[in-house]
């Protein structure tokens, strides 16, 4: 059988369940139930419940929307029991437990974080969740950290960091999601003790003020280096996925004038290539929405594990559009399909730790990076795309 997986999840949010939450039922952050969930495969003829006949089978590892081919037979209970299955691009897993473990397509090479060919260092600076425009009680600290970041990018002599000599080797800056803090709850938190809530006009004014600060920040750094600005669900520009680039009308004349040369308003997910040595390296990046939604409907809690599954499924978010709002597209190409394996796959996260792993798929080395939350850690990542190495930059500021 060949079709798409469908996972029935009774804990999936619904209008009536949302009413229960309003009436006092505790809200949940994940909707997976190992006992109640059911796994199906569906095609044009209908939907068939399935189960795996091998010891390592776990239905919680599957989500809806995965292209799948299975081999097996239907038992007397009407369940299709499969012992072999295939994902996109001829990735097989065998019913035998030993073969199942040995046939894992993800091989972690014994490579460390060192230069491979002593090439000239060329860096991309990844900044995730910079969240310009914190609530007032955190504004001073946020501005101070941002000032240190600007000084680092401008390679000012007065910045006290061992990494200042790397600034002139940065070829591109990528702001990966949540560049603007537009979360209403952030503004609510500062006055929650007053049992009051800011009006929509106050929130809109705060968002507008934050856009002005973002404009000033971009104006400072775009005079020095190329910037790619990725949108996210928190920028309130386009809540449908994949997200189009931010509207130019959101930016001042100074920034828009620079935009034609060094400020690139890009999409989310973001696919691009950059020249490395005598070849081009292919990058795929997301602002993390696909990772977050897959976490809610699967057993995976680690961003890197989900990123591996994205590559295995050859899709950034198979679960869309059922659980992640997806805009309709009239051509035959799925915009979230991974048609070519990347050299680097990166994503934004709300996590404190930076996670980095090198894997090999189909004899190709792929680097996975789950970026640290800059607003929580004041950390960003310098990735040397010539030598496949990285450095973590941390800005410390004491009031």
Question: What are the functions of these language-model segments?
Answer:
Residues 1-399:
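Extended recognition/assembly regions associated with phosphoester-bond processing machinery
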């Amino acid at each position: 059988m060949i079709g798409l997986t469908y996972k029935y999840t009774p804990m999936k949010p619904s209008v009536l369940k949302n009413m229960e939450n309003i009436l006092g039922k505790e809200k949940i952050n994940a909707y997976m139930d190992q006992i109640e969930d059911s796994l199906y495969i569906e095609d044009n003829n209908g939907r068939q419940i399935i189960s795996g006949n091998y010891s390592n089978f776990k239905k919680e590892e599957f989500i809806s929307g995965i292209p799948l081919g299975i081999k097996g037979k239907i038992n007397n209970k009407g369940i299709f029991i499969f012992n072999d299955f295939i994902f996109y691009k001829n990735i097989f897993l065998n019913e035998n437990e030993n073969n199942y473990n040995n046939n894992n397509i993800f091989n972690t090479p014994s490579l460390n974080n060192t230069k491979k060919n002593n090439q000239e260092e060329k860096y991309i600076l990844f900044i995730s969740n910079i969240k310009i425009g914190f609530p007032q009680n955190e504004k001073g600290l946020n501005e101070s950290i941002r000032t240190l970041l600007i000084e680092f990018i401008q390679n000012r002599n007065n910045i006290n960091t061992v990494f200042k000599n790397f600034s002139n080797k940065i070829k591109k800056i990528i702001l990966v999601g949540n560049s603007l803090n537009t979360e209403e709850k952030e503004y609510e938190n500062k006055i929650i003790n007053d049992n009051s809530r800011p009006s929509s006009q106050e929130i809109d004014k705060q968002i507008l003020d934050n856009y002005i600060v973002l404009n000033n920040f971009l104006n400072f750094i775009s005079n020095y280096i190329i910037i790619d600005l990725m949108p996210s669900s928190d920028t309130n520009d386009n809540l449908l996925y994949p997200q189009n680039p931010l509207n130019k009308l959101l930016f001042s004349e100074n920034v828009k004038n620079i935009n034609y040369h060094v400020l690139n308003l890009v999409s989310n997910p973001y696919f691009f290539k950059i020249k490395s040595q005598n070849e081009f390296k292919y990058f795929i990046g997301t602002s993390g929405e696909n990772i977050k939604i897959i976490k809610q409907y699967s057993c995976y809690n680690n961003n890197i594990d989900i990123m591996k599954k994205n590559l295995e499924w050859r899709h950034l978010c198979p679960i869309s559009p059922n659980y992640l709002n997806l805009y309709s597209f009239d051509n035959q190409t799925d915009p979230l399909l991974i048609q070519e394996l990347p050299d680097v796959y990166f994503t934004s996260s709300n996590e404190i730790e930076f996670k980095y792993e090198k894997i090999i798929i189909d004899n190709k080395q792929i680097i996975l990076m789950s970026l640290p939350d800059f607003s929580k850690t004041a950390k960003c990542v310098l990735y040397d795309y010539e030598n496949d190495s990285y450095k973590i930059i941390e800005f410390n500021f004491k009031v």
